């Protein structure tokens, strides 16, 4: 949420209208679609935050990336804020924080030279998936920050979608799996 009029509408504000005590448990980049978890109260927020910190929440994203990405692999390069170019992040082996992403190609379209890929972040750095894909030469289609030609893509937004979350509900211990297919 920000002060500008375009920042006065958000998923969080919409949830607050229904659950006034709701708390944010994690975030998505503004251009990323998909699943979000909100806690109904402070105790649930604290418990969910602990699950995220302990990496006990499984997250998968679906993305369309430029080029034919390998069938599977990982990107394990440290990230840091690119201060002169905020909000951009960048790879820094000297000063960056550990960041790891697993990827698995779902399919490749030779006509468009675009791969559909499942991304699994092991860590949770800002813009991690976006920077990692660009770093290995497969930027996410429509990414205004990290794709050298973001307008080359026909969708009106970035092709990155939080499609899957799984965790043990911290208060009831019920196993929860949420799946929301990408619209692209």
Predicted regions and their residues:
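RNA pseudouridine synthases
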Residues: 1-184
């Amino acid at each position: 949420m920000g002060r500008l009029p375009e920042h006065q509408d958000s998923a969080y504000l919409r949830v607050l209208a229904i659950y006034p005590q709701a708390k944010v448990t994690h975030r998505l980049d503004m251009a990323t679609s998909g699943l979000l978890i909100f806690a109904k109260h402070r105790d649930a927020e604290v418990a969910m935050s602990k699950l995220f910190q302990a990496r006990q929440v499984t997250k998968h994203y679906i993305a369309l990336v430029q080029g034919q990405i390998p069938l599977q692999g990982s990107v394990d390069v440290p990230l840091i804020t690119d201060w002169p170019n905020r909000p951009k992040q960048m790879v820094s082996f000297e000063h960056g924080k550990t960041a790891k992403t697993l990827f698995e190609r779902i399919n490749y379209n030779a006509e468009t030279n675009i791969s559909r890929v499942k991304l699994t972040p092991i860590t949770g750095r800002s813009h991690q998936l976006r920077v990692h894909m660009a770093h290995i030469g497969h930027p996410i289609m429509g990414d205004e920050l990290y794709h050298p030609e973001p307008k080359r893509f026909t969708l009106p937004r970035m092709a990155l979608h939080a499609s899957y979350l799984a965790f043990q509900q911290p208060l009831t211990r019920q196993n929860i799996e949420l799946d929301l297919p990408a619209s692209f």
